[in-house]
């Protein structure tokens, strides 16, 4: 039967040193706790914590050798082992006589942070999600991502060390907000230290690197990474080059989806600049343009596979478009430029024939809603009653419509999504 006294707490053959090596510490152990542990035996002049692969080792250096010997001797003869937060700590003399350069690269304050993303799905955290998280603390100049033996990592460059420090203090050890991650991605946490870099070199805009100070930097074709290989996700599928323009395909379109309906749905994630609707392959598609890529990324991850109406109707399938700026010359019921103060509006014309005569249940998206069309269902993002009941006004608003009844809050397959807000990063967990 093992006991605390039988554990290898001391290295008896190691010659005494004023530097002690501590093992089995809690991984989040702080420098203050190490000083408190050694204070009864003398003056601790230096520490080095979070050492080792598991970050559960540390070194403490006393002012003189006798103080270190006193601490080792005390715990060698005591029935109560050294403890930090209730966890037994094993002590031994270090083979070093002093802690040299306690301020390692990771401790020297700088404007560039080294971020390690931890979690089974760490590689699925996009560079735009990282930008959303860190830009809450100040302007992010550049981000590069890469893989090392330590895992999936990123370098995040801020304007100055003060901004970087604020981000590090707030985010180190925290989890990425759940709403920023795709449903298939598990929890991912951040471990942050300072980097020795002061200015990152970014040659191409890609899914692995981004320079937010140089909009004219060329985009890496087909999201090819530095190894010359097409980037793939953990499922083996080719990763899409991200874009500020989304291509939305609407499946099972039993009810009208107008331009204003699309604007209400997509504007919940940020300012929508332009929308263009068109028919293709017997279905309705739309291009939605945001002002930046990161907003489009969040909208895509949140809306992909969800339905505009309860019952699985008007299901959204979203991909990135190769377009970056839509050309919209006039505003009508199929296209709109929300950045134009007084856009030209064409005069309405009566259709030559009833486009719904052949199939009254089919929606052709050319003339808005029709009296022969099915009544919109209760619940979902859009309230029934056609365009007039959406509360859209002239330019719409950035909130989902509240569900008409509590019963519609239960999400079935592809059903109603409860209201959410997608601004900056939310509270960390």
Curated annotation (Swiss-Prot):
<dbReference type="GO" id="GO:0006417">
    <property type="term" value="P:regulation of translation"/>
</dbReference>
<keyword id="KW-0007">Acetylation</keyword>
<dbReference type="InterPro" id="IPR034794">
    <property type="entry name" value="PTBPH1/PTBPH2_RRM3"/>
</dbReference>
<feature type="domain" description="RRM 2">
    <location>
        <begin position="110"/>
        <end position="197"/>
    </location>
</feature>
<dbReference type="InterPro" id="IPR012677">
    <property type="entry name" value="Nucleotide-bd_a/b_plait_sf"/>
</dbReference>
<dbReference type="InterPro" id="IPR000504">
    <property type="entry name" value="RRM_dom"/>
</dbReference>
<feature type="modified residue" description="N-acetylserine">
    <location>
        <position position="2"/>
    </location>
</feature>
<dbReference type="InterPro" id="IPR021790">
    <property type="entry name" value="PTBP1-like_RRM2"/>
</dbReference>
<feature type="compositionally biased region" description="Gly residues">
    <location>
        <begin position="382"/>
        <end position="397"/>
    </location>
</feature>
<keyword id="KW-0677">Repeat</keyword>
<comment type="function">
    <text>Plays a role in pre-mRNA splicing. Binds to the polypyrimidine tract of introns. May promote the binding of U2 snRNP to pre-mRNA.</text>
</comment>
<feature type="compositionally biased region" description="Low complexity">
    <location>
        <begin position="367"/>
        <end position="381"/>
    </location>
</feature>
<dbReference type="GO" id="GO:0000932">
    <property type="term" value="C:P-body"/>
</dbReference>
<feature type="domain" description="RRM 3">
    <location>
        <begin position="243"/>
        <end position="323"/>
    </location>
</feature>
<keyword id="KW-0539">Nucleus</keyword>
<keyword id="KW-0507">mRNA processing</keyword>
<dbReference type="GO" id="GO:0005634">
    <property type="term" value="C:nucleus"/>
</dbReference>
<dbReference type="GO" id="GO:0043484">
    <property type="term" value="P:regulation of RNA splicing"/>
</dbReference>
<dbReference type="InterPro" id="IPR035979">
    <property type="entry name" value="RBD_domain_sf"/>
</dbReference>
<dbReference type="GO" id="GO:0008380">
    <property type="term" value="P:RNA splicing"/>
</dbReference>
<feature type="domain" description="RRM 1">
    <location>
        <begin position="18"/>
        <end position="96"/>
    </location>
</feature>
<dbReference type="Pfam" id="PF13893">
    <property type="entry name" value="RRM_5"/>
</dbReference>
<dbReference type="GO" id="GO:0009845">
    <property type="term" value="P:seed germination"/>
</dbReference>
<keyword id="KW-0508">mRNA splicing</keyword>
<feature type="region of interest" description="Disordered">
    <location>
        <begin position="331"/>
        <end position="429"/>
    </location>
</feature>
<keyword id="KW-0694">RNA-binding</keyword>
<dbReference type="Pfam" id="PF00076">
    <property type="entry name" value="RRM_1"/>
</dbReference>
<dbReference type="GO" id="GO:0006397">
    <property type="term" value="P:mRNA processing"/>
</dbReference>
<dbReference type="InterPro" id="IPR034792">
    <property type="entry name" value="PTBPH1/PTBPH2_RRM1"/>
</dbReference>
<dbReference type="GO" id="GO:0000381">
    <property type="term" value="P:regulation of alternative mRNA splicing, via spliceosome"/>
</dbReference>
<dbReference type="GO" id="GO:0003723">
    <property type="term" value="F:RNA binding"/>
</dbReference>
<dbReference type="InterPro" id="IPR034793">
    <property type="entry name" value="PTBPH1/PTBPH2_RRM2"/>
</dbReference>
<protein>
    <recommendedName>
        <fullName>Polypyrimidine tract-binding protein homolog 2</fullName>
    </recommendedName>
</protein>
<dbReference type="GO" id="GO:0003729">
    <property type="term" value="F:mRNA binding"/>
</dbReference>
<dbReference type="GO" id="GO:0005737">
    <property type="term" value="C:cytoplasm"/>
</dbReference>
<dbReference type="Pfam" id="PF11835">
    <property type="entry name" value="RRM_8"/>
</dbReference>
